[in-house]
């Protein structure tokens, strides 16, 4: 299946939109965590040092599943081989479990994600966009078939 054929599939378009939203949300979450990290540990001097912290420091560990998921989406969206609709639907299903949206979830990832949503309006807005795109309405209603 070529990209031209895939681009007519609503799920493919949803995945492309999700990738863009998650990339922006991920950057905003990284920036928020950098601010928090620097308040405690001091200024991060270089982009290289920040990159090393992001990939190796426990402080940023909760964000790594989002990073890895973005890479997986890129692999599917940029695949030279045909991509099945099942692959796309599987990624969309995994995305629904990716973000710790529950305010009652006691995990560190959920607590930090909720804190970021509360402290940064842009993160709250992007989170809402992802939630709406993935049909994760708080009421449990599926807005799109």
Regions found by a protein language model. Give the residues of each.
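Surface-exposed peri-terminal alpha-helical interaction modules
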Residues: 1-145
């Amino acid at each position: 299946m070529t990209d031209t054929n895939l681009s007519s599939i609503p799920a493919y378009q949803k995945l492309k939109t999700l990738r863009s939203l998650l990339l922006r949300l991920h950057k905003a979450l990284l920036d928020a965590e950098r601010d928090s990290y620097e308040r405690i540990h001091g200024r991060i001097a270089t982009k290289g040092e920040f990159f090393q912290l992001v990939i190796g420091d426990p402080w940023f560990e909760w964000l790594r599943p989002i990073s890895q998921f973005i890479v997986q989406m890129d692999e599917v969206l940029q695949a030279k081989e045909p991509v099945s609709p099942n692959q796309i639907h599987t990624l969309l299903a995994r995305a629904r479990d990716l973000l710790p949206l529950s305010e009652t979830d006691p995990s560190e990832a959920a607590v930090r994600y909720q804190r970021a949503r509360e402290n940064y309006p842009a993160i709250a807005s992007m989170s809402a966009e992802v939630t709406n795109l993935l049909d994760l309405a708080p009421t449990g209603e599926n807005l799109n078939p």
